[in-house]
Amino acid sequence: MTTVMGTEAETMTTTWTLSGFGDEIDPDPAVQAAVLQSLGAGCIEVRSAWGVNIVDLDEDQLDALAAVFEERGMAVSAIASPVGKVDVTLPADHEVERLGRAIRAAERLGTRYIRLFSFFRGEGVAVEDIRDDVMARMRALADAAELAGVVLLHENEKDIYGDTPERCLDIVETVGSPALRLAWDSANFVQVGVAHPFDDGYALLRPHLEYLQVKDARSATGEVTPAGEGDGQVLETLTALRDDGYTGFASLEPHLTDVNALGGFSGPAAFGVAARAFRRLTDRIGVELA
């Protein structure tokens, strides 16, 4: 009997772990988990629960949140903290203390990743003028993360210091900590005028990328769109990540209907639209989502 063996390409399928910002679906974490699982995700990124930011949940609330996820068999990919999403003139200790609360949540919910930002500046203040203060704060945060054994994921949020590829690189190279890595967000790059995020930023940042946040945007209006429907070169980015051997998280953050104090919101229906758009892209390039 002759056995036909599969090719190497057929046997070495790339798999990424699908996650998503649960509070974009509903304030109730039980609903968040149910919808994510219905879309094929086994993980959740936690930004808030019951309308309360993750760093403001008390011990009882964290225990209740952990119980919800444990009951449903849902793992936590990252804590989507608000650390660093404040004016740089606030005392450094302010954000170090909030990071401590995010670390507490990460430990309780069983993840090593914590999303953070690199500070806003006042109106009329040049970005170059806040660099030293930003770096001092990012070093302090990275030091705290190293001590706790967690990894900080810097998101390229619009209008913070690190909102362009060049300044994201500046942060990780200047701080130089293994506890500070990068999350890639194509839409945010588009919204600050990076015309071609993949062409302009991928090679620069790939050595430091550890996490993928999934959304897209149109350059003419800044409108957020499902992945592949904007100008963020999402397909090119996904293809390169596949070819580079990326095997980490892909976290849906659609922002399709609203932006509020806790972040973006989509609702179950729009979140599903975003999830299916992303899956069409990964199917196209032969990446499995688990």
Language model segments and positions:
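Active-site acidic/histidine proton-transfer and metal-coordination neighborhood
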Residues: 28-34, 68-72, 87-182, 191, ...
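Histidine-acidic metal/acid-base catalytic patches
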Residues: 2-19, 25-42, 66, 70, ...
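Glycine-rich, proline-tolerant flexible connector loops at the mouths of alpha/beta enzymes
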Residues: 46-66, 119-125
